[in-house]
Amino acid sequence: MATLYVSPHLDDFRSLLALVAAEYCGNAKQQSQVWQWLSFADNELTPVSCAVVFPLMGMTGLDKKIQQNSRVELMRVLKVLDQALEPRTFLVGESITLADMAVAMAVLLPFKYVLEPSDRNVLMNVTRWFTTCINQPEFLKVLGKISLCEKMVPVTAKTSTEEAAAVHPDAAALNGPPKTEAQLKKEAKKREKLEKFQQKKEMEAKKKMQPVAEKKAKPEKRELGVITYDIPTPSGEKKDVVSPLPDSYSPQYVEAAWYPWWEKQGFFKPEFGRKSIGEQNPRGIFMMCIPPPNVTGSLHLGHALTNAIQDTLTRWHRMRGETTLWNPGCDHAGIATQVVVEKKLMREKGTSRHDLGREKFIEEVWKWKNEKGDRIYHQLKKLGSSLDWDRACFTMDPKLSYAVQEAFIRMHDEGVIYRSKRLVNWSCSLNSAISDIEVDKNELSGRTLLPVPGYKEKVEFGVLVSFAYKVDGSDEEVVVATTRIETMLGDTAVAVHPSDSRYQHLKGKTVLHPFCDRKIPVVFDDFVDMSFGTGAVKITPAHDHNDYEVGVRHNLAFINILDENGFVINVPPPFLGMKRFDARKAVLQALKDRDQFKEIKDNPMVVPVCSRSKDIVEPLMKPQWYVSCSDMGKQAADAVREGRLKIIPDHHSQTWFNWMDNIRDWCISRQLWWGHRIPAYFITVSDPSVKPGEDMDGHYRVSGRTPEEAREKAAKRFNVSPDKIALRQDEDVLDTWFSSGINPFSILGWPNETEDLNVFYPGTLLETGHDILFFWVARMVMMGLKLTGKLPFKEVYHCAVVRDAHGRKMSKSLGNVIDPLDDHIGIALEGLHAQLMDTNLDPLEVEKPKKVQKADYPNCIPECGTDALRFALCAYTSQGRDINLDVNRILGYRHFCNKLWNAVKFAMRTLGDQFVPADTSPAEREESVSDRWILSRLSTAVAQCDAAFRTYDFPAITTAIYNFWLYELCDVYLESVKPVFIKAKEDGSCERPAAVCRQTLYTCLEVGLRLLAPLMPFVTEELYQRLPRRRPQSDPPSICVTPYPDAAEFCWQCEDVDRDIDFIMGVVRTIRSLRSDYKLTKTAADCYLQCTDAATVSLVQKYSLQIQTLSYSQAIVPLMAPQPAPEGCAVAIASDRCTVNMMLKGLIDVEKEVPKLMGKKTDLEKQIEKLSEKISKGDYKEKVPVKVQEQDTEKLRQSQTELEKVKEAMDNFQKMM
């Protein structure tokens, strides 16, 4: 055996890691995963481990700040590792690999010297894995027994020798072999990088030592600090609301403990607050079932969108006092789940499902489901989804399985379900028919090489091959073209258009197949496009959907040339037994050899690809079970036409009619093992008077709830005794959409007459994406009408489809699929990379999504919280429009949460501990103008939300709430009433206005939080629980069951006050703009407001205190035009009624400001010239809309007025100089 020399230098050793990883791994995917973990250890763990441990060991100097930051970074990286290890014993596979060795060595020193027991409690999965590793024989042999850190080691000072070693690292390797020139160069580069890094750190440290005034920290950074809720609270018990609120909003603090309490209190159950669900509720019933997500994995942002909308609606209806049920569930996802488990078995055990057999394989799927299935429910709870978990259903549960069986048997007995041999979408890799929704349409612009499972080389698509058929008994030939040349082996006709004069002489003629001993008729059919190619088309009825219809019309032969695995059959050698795409090459070459090949050229086309297996989908003739849909489709279309079923937005109705009016029968059988096995049996009768049945003969098929029932049916049908009947149950399972189609009533107990079914069926609403309008929604409607005689719901609301910030559909292969919890708790870039290891992506495909993740999230996805995520999704959803959601924009709504938090904290301090709210909401008695204005704005927000909820206008809801809290309550009202509270403190006789303000402020907080509660359940609950109650003994215990503000109750709109304050805020904004222009950030100036009439002067006088406070002015002086303002003022127009003159004399450098005004004057003159030129054009009046003309005229007038004011200001400045 050859001796392997290992250099003592790490850089030489690293080059061997990939070879070792490849040598000792079971397959390519594991090799790739090992290499990724090696990269993780080398690039993420080792540097930060050294940064923490080396100063403690005296190997480097100690900078406490840097060392503290490094420790925080170490914990962050280890938490990523902890998350990845949650479902694993070892990092790759089920045994120790090089990945475990490398990563364990990277964390060895932290575990020995840094990570105390409290740290290890946080890192339970990492600690479990590390202790498992170090106790393996391979580790014990080299490391011996490792003791874990009990208390972090004290700092050791560096010796002079060690200092020298740090400066001259070459000295550390004197005992090793001499280094090469390349190694010395590499180490020199490393030293250079280290020096630059140290210089950078020194610069950062110097900056931190500078006075705060030179660079003020941004408040946004402080807002993102993580604050946790650490008060021990047993699950289900109410959270502590007595302790003071933290200084800033933190999702981890706010979202802790509330959900288990909501659940335990039963707030999400329809029974809450009433004796029984059966009692009449005058406010009505709201019922909605969740579109059951697939059990195969995790929710993505698309699921988060639908759940944010559904939960917002559910909470709104619940707060309106309706009997409310939102029913959870999970779909067994037949093909998707089977594929995942099959890959898992092959990856981990090298076993296929056929090796195990059907029964054992099903056990493995159930085992996987029980381990992984709850993750989706966990995610839904983290999103705050107020589902009644006691009613949760899984489509393979006994209750739902019984309903599926009953539905099949009833429809089969009626003849609605039947068996037939037709073309289906076939996946050769899965050996199963698949539904249209599982077929991806891969659009090609021309010649393209695509990977196909089972083929080493990529296969050519996107080309059109032309070849000739010889006319029998003639030298003439007919040229046809095809994109699938291999299918010509199954051709049974050549079709031309009946009106095509070029081929009239071929009526009744045949052409000769070059490889098969058969003559092919020339048929005339209207479907042929005379203008395409030669106007002649090859017909392969058994392998093309259009050709199938032609074959039926002309009674052609249906020759199947492919078996279930994609091998060529029913043809002569040499093609017999070839793989389909190998046959493609062979047929092409054979045509060339016979001089019947004409040309090959690029051809734009759509290639059907199986979304599960990535195989090319083949149309294949297979015996399958079908549902007859013509009658049910007509009923479903009529329901929408007659207004009994409403589709929102209504432009989807046309799509509905197109599908329903042209519906085809539905193939419901799948050649899988996981799913609802079809309860149908093939009958064999042991009686000479009964001839043997054929597979396609429906007379020899019977369905039954049990074999005994099926046998009795068969015996009765053939008039023989049951003992002469032998049954063979169908091997296939039902399409997943079949069980999903009866979901609205099967979850309520159908076919049994349960109380839930009587109360909650039909449901109120279905909310889902428009992409499954036909696959799921239509089938629920059809099956609901067929089996219950009722529509399953009254309305269908289609939300948008979530795309990434670049408008791309979210896809694992693109790396842009985001787990909603990543937005909720935040995740580092390496965590996103680690998630890719858990997908079914080929190892070679992982690098592309990694690059996408690095480009979109160069550092991390910041922690935003559930409330911000929900609000963002609702804010950006618009009827009929997809969402291009930039995850970073969610961060803006996290800042909104912080603004909300600070506003309530300020208000609570202002209200004081002794504040007692009035029994009723305020009426117009003692309220000031500011009070009446904010109550008017609150009333407007209530009305806007009420109207928008009823029309599913979620952007209008979020806009109304956001504007009220941020721009009206925080920016205006809270600022304008501060002087009232200050005056009350200084003068006890002014307490009454302050008391009225407090009542108004309380009303705004309490009603504003209730407005927001359906969208942001966690932060509103946290803040609501801190508010005093109007009626402490009778008010609801939680904000989620308080009444939603009603427009009829909160009717405080005051148009006069709104109009006045709107004018005042225009003045304030103008003053603020001037202050900003002249950099008067901390200096209050006198403002002279020139008014055009006495009414405006009076208005300014009335609101002078508010203007002064909100604009941070020294004094507000109203002037009646033409009374001039003093010299030395900056001028800006607030409106056509008021001009702002802000005194700058003595506050700014006039010599610098005059050039600014000259620049503004030039811009205005150009603008006026451009507008004047536009308006003076001869065809302006005829071509430009009247509204635009009015806008242009107004712009011109305002620009001319502003120019005059600028000139006036320049004159004033000239006088000041």
UniProtKB/Swiss-Prot annotation:
ATP-binding found in the keyword field: yes
One Pfam short name: GST_C
A GO CC annotation given for this chain: cytosol
SUPFAM superfamilies: Anticodon-binding domain of a subclass of class I aminoacyl-tRNA synthetases, GST C-terminal domain-like, Nucleotidylyl transferase, tRNA-binding arm, ValRS/IleRS/LeuRS editing domain
Domain GST C-terminal: 27-155
Entry's Gene Ontology molecular function annotations: aminoacyl-tRNA deacylase activity; ATP binding; valine-tRNA ligase activity
Protein name: Valine--tRNA ligase
